[in-house]
Amino acid sequence: FSGLEAAIVLIAFVVVAAVFSYVMLGAGFFAT
């Protein structure tokens, strides 16, 4: 498990979290 793999996993996790929060925020705005 190299540093590069750790960086890729970390970046992927941040991207997924950002997209998920953006979708939830958009759904909340549409629901109200």
Swiss-Prot record:
One Pfam family this chain carries?
A: Arch_flagellin
The entry lists its GO molecular-function terms as:
structural molecule activity
For this UniProt record, give its keywords in alphabetical order, as a comma-separated list: Archaeal flagellum, Glycoprotein
InterPro entries membership: Flagellin/pilin_N_arc (IPR013373), Flagellin_arc (IPR002774)
Cellular localisation:
Archaeal flagellum
Query: What biological process terms from GO does the record include?
Result: archaeal or bacterial-type flagellum-dependent cell motility
Query: Which intervals of the chain form a coiled coil?
Result: none
Where does the signal peptide begin and end?
none
Mention any one GO cellular component term assigned to this protein in its UniProt record: archaeal-type flagellum
Question: How does the record describe the protein's post-translational processing?
Answer: Glycosylated.
Which family, according to the similarity comment? Belongs to the archaeal flagellin family.
**Additional notes on this entry:** There are 2 or 3 different flagellins in M.hungatei.
**Role description:** Flagellin is the subunit protein which polymerizes to form the filaments of archaeal flagella.
- What name does this protein carry? 24 kDa flagellin
